[in-house]
Amino acid sequence: MIELHRVSKVYSVGPVKVPALSDVSLRINKGEFVVLTGASGAGKTTLLRLLYRDDLPSDGNVEVFGHDLGTLKHRDVAALRRSIGVVFQDAKLLPVRTVYENVAFVLRVLGTPKREITQRVFDALRVVGLSSRAQAYPAQLSQGEAQRASLARAIVRKPPLLLADEPTGNLDEAMEDEILGVLRDIWAGGTTVVLATHQAYLARALRRRTLTLQSGRLVKDEG
């Protein structure tokens, strides 16, 4: 499903070249739950951005769903992204829309029939345990509820791949456990999950395959 072949990424900051990833090769199979860990600045977010084609590698090849993202035509990028759910540390909910409207938004943009939207939104809210908060606004949600709403939005199109970038970074321990439980449920439903976190203990708690980045290099592949 995902393959990186000797991938490097270098950013230019004025005249200075800053390496973010260096010679990373890995494979993630369909149906895996993989934890990507490492300190802040290790390259986790850069790697995820390459996977949903928000950026391109400086060297090497990135393949997702069998497509080489470096040669993917512009018109095919949107189709790729529709097959990938993405969640960030900040829930990024639209403040003037209800939970239901936030989750439904992308389906409306795609012209999905109203009846199908209703079914898909409530299916997603049920998975994340937020059905009773469908008409609440973001300001009325706890941080954990807001992140669950963000997860519902990410899975409402039933993507085969979910990328989660530090989704528990702003949460307390109880809320963190809630989100990890939701991620397990999403994975159990057949979605491939890649979770990036700087919190190494989460990888141990999840007992899943763990990829460790250090200064842009893949230094461990365990589990």
Q: Model segments located where?
A:
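ABC ATPase NBD coupling module
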Residues: 15-18, 69-85, 114, 186-188
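Helix-to-loop junction immediately C-terminal to a conserved catalytic motif
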Residues: 52
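Conserved ABC transporter NBD signature motif
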Residues: 60-68
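Short coil-to-helix segment of the ABC ATPase nucleotide-binding domain corresponding to the Q-loop/switch region
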Residues: 97-105
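Conserved signature/switch motifs of ABC ATPase nucleotide-binding domains
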Residues: 136-139, 157, 189
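Conserved ABC ATPase signature
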Residues: 137-141, 145-147
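Catalytic Walker B motif of ABC-type/P-loop ATPase nucleotide-binding domains
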Residues: 162-165
